[in-house]
């Protein structure tokens, strides 16, 4: 499985090669050294700072969260013909989940699934230890 380097590692590597390329370029002590500005760096094949960090900025940019309101529900299929329930405008996600849960539990209760589950989960007596487990001498009898 291939490993993906972190953004900081990529940025540090980019800066290392940029410094190495500038130092191995033409000498800056000649008569043209005063004319060597940032635009001249691009002529040496070095990317501009804005071009080298565009991916970094876009990676950490926040993604907008969908607004779950009545008018937005139709766009994501909330109140469409295939939806399970009509959602009133202005409800939040928590109440929507509770409504879905109660509807599903109601459907399960109609089929008897919930009652069978509840009956299997009820504990009538104190749980007994396993056959091979040693007795707890510290517990009251």
Curated annotation (Swiss-Prot):
InterPro entries: PPDPF (IPR026754)
Pfam families, per database record: PPDFL
Entry superkingdom: Eukaryota
Protein name per Swiss-Prot or TrEMBL: Pancreatic progenitor cell differentiation and proliferation factor-like protein
Organism: Bos taurus (Bovine)
Location of the region described as Disordered in the Swiss-Prot/TrEMBL record: 72-141
Biased composition (Low complexity): 95-105
GO biological process: cell differentiation
Compositionally biased residues, Polar residues: 112-122
Similarity annotation: Belongs to the PPDPF family.
């Amino acid at each position: 499985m291939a490993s993906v380097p972190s953004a900081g590692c990529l940025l540090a590597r980019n800066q290392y090669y940029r410094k190495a390329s500038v130092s191995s370029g033409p000498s800056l002590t000649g008569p043209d050294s005063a004319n060597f500005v940032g635009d001249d760096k691009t002529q040496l094949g070095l990317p501009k700072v804005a071009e080298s960090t565009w991916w970094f900025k876009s990676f950490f940019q926040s993604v907008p969260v969908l607004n779950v309101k009545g008018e937005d529900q139709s766009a994501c299929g909330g109140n469409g013909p295939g939806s399970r329930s009509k959602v009133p405008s202005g409800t939040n996600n928590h109440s929507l989940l509770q409504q879905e849960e109660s509807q599903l539990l109601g459907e399960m209760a109609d089929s008897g699934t919930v009652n069978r589950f509840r009956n299997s989960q009820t504990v009538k007596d104190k749980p007994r230890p396993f056959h091979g487990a040693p007795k707890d001498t510290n517990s009251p009898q």
